[in-house]
Amino acid sequence: MLLKPHSRVQVFEGAEDNLPDRDALRAALAIRQLAEGLTADDLLLVLISGGGSALLPAPIPPVTLEEKQTLTRLLAARGATIQELNTIRKALSQLKGGGLAQAAYPAQVVSLILSDVVGDPVEVIASGPTVASSHSVQDCLHILNRYGLRAALPRSVKTVLSRADSDPHGPRTCGHVLNVIIGSNVLALAEAQRQAEALGYQAVVLSAAMQGDVKSMAQFYGLLAHVARTRLTPSTAGASVEEDAQLHELAAELQIPDLQLEEALETMARGRGPVCLLAGGEPTVQLQGSGRGGRNQELALRVGAELRRWPLGQIDVLFLSGGTDGQDGPTEAAGAWVTPELASQAAAEGLDMATFLAHNDSHTFFCRLQGGAHLLHTGMTGTNVMDTHLLFLRPR
């Protein structure tokens, strides 16, 4: 960013690869100093989005930045959700969990928020720097036990947790703070739905709260495509009672709130042309290998593997998964798209899908398949409101 001469704006860059670093720590301490100098006559405007946790690291002494960073990496590698990661971050931070609001008191605080978290909980987004935390030390210990990390905690982390009060981290009322959601996955899906309808699709938003294990989610989408076939083409044999029940069991297993599954099935049963099912959220990938990829490319690859399991008859199916920020994991792609022909296309080029999945190497797979034709490239969008999943179904 180029500033005008004598500008009062200060720009701090940091958190390369979305990980807290010394530059981000320097910025966080400067922000704290600015906030602590405000009075009741001041207004603090805070812009919050995904990545805010990494950009505002200020560990509570004696915890060091490196110790906090290592713990976050270990939790993420073992499949911790963003909510769980942020609960730990808040417990170890001076500014998260309402700490920034506390530092700015008694100034008025207005936070404009882009949500990158399922359900848009303001206390979780960027670890809630302007929202009092409702989590206790016991919540943190429960998370650490779940992922087998409590025994391996550094002494400094144990010290901070042992002396932490279980009361909210920030002021009890936060009456001087106004938090406003200005962008979210719900809004993104609503616009995508309008665009799909303009293209002639019957469009249904399944949920903006898709989360859970990426394997189970892929199974859900694969089976959904099969069950959808029987609704779109009534002349074909219908899905069995067992398959319908299995689809609902998978949905229950994923614990998707407000899932509009019945509405989607009823829309397809009316048989009025092509259908676009939309969903959004953030699945969890447990890392087992050292390959390159991201959750969108992994989900797309797994859905492609699932689609070959089911007879899809006289409908064309395409599944796309993409990150709204334009970057899926440490790759240049936003995601990928697949069709039921993926398995045969891969086999024709000597690519074993199972091997790539075992190494979490979805990006390498899609780069090699047909010269990268299945990759979704949008460039960086500057806005992260999680992922979007699109399932297109068109009778032939």
Curated annotation (Swiss-Prot):
GO MF annotation list: ATP binding; glycerate kinase activity
Domain of life of the source: Eukaryota
Subcellular location: Cytoplasm
Gene Ontology BP, a term: protein phosphorylation
UniProt enzyme class: transferase
Nucleotide-binding recorded as keyword: yes
Protein name: Glycerate kinase
InterPro entries for this protein: GK-like_C_sf (IPR037035), GK_N_sf (IPR038614), MOFRL (IPR007835), MOFRL_assoc_dom (IPR025286), MOFRL_protein (IPR039760)
Coiled-coil annotated residue ranges, if any: none
Entry's transmembrane regions: none
Alphabetical list of PANTHER family matching this protein: GLYCERATE KINASE
Transferase recorded as keyword: yes
Family label: Belongs to the glycerate kinase type-2 family.
Catalytic reactions on record: (R)-glycerate + ATP = (2R)-3-phosphoglycerate + ADP + H(+)
Example of a GO cellular component annotation carried by this entry: cytoplasm
Alphabetical UniProt keywords: ATP-binding, Cytoplasm, Kinase, Nucleotide-binding, Transferase
EC numbers on record: 2.7.1.31
Disulphide-bridged cysteine pairs: none
Pfam family, one: DUF4147
